[in-house]
């Protein structure tokens, strides 16, 4: 899956 949320959480 795409960790778009994780990228936004940086």
UniProtKB/Swiss-Prot annotation:
Q: Where in the cell is it found?
A: Secreted
Descriptive protein name: Fibrinogen beta chain
Coiled-coil spans in chain:
none
What function is annotated for this protein?
A: Cleaved by the protease thrombin to yield monomers which, together with fibrinogen alpha (FGA) and fibrinogen gamma (FGG), polymerize to form an insoluble fibrin matrix. Fibrin has a major function in hemostasis as one of the primary components of blood clots. In addition, functions during the early stages of wound repair to stabilize the lesion and guide cell migration during re-epithelialization. Was originally thought to be essential for platelet aggregation, based on in vitro studies using anticoagulated blood.
Changes after translation:
Conversion of fibrinogen to fibrin is triggered by thrombin, which cleaves fibrinopeptides A and B from alpha and beta chains, and thus exposes the N-terminal polymerization sites responsible for the formation of the soft clot.
List the gene name.
FGB
The UniProt entry's GO CC annotations, sorted and at most eight, read: extracellular region
Is Coiled coil among the key words of this record?
yes
Q: Which GO terms describe its biological process?
A: adaptive immune response; blood coagulation; innate immune response
Q: Which keywords accompany this UniProt record?
A: Adaptive immunity, Blood coagulation, Coiled coil, Disulfide bond, Hemostasis, Immunity, Innate immunity, Secreted
Keyword DNA repair recorded: no
Q: What is known of its domains?
A: A long coiled coil structure formed by 3 polypeptide chains connects the central nodule to the C-terminal domains (distal nodules). The long C-terminal ends of the alpha chains fold back, contributing a fourth strand to the coiled coil structure.
Principal place of residence: secreted
């Amino acid at each position: 899956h795409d960790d778009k949320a994780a990228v936004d959480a940086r």
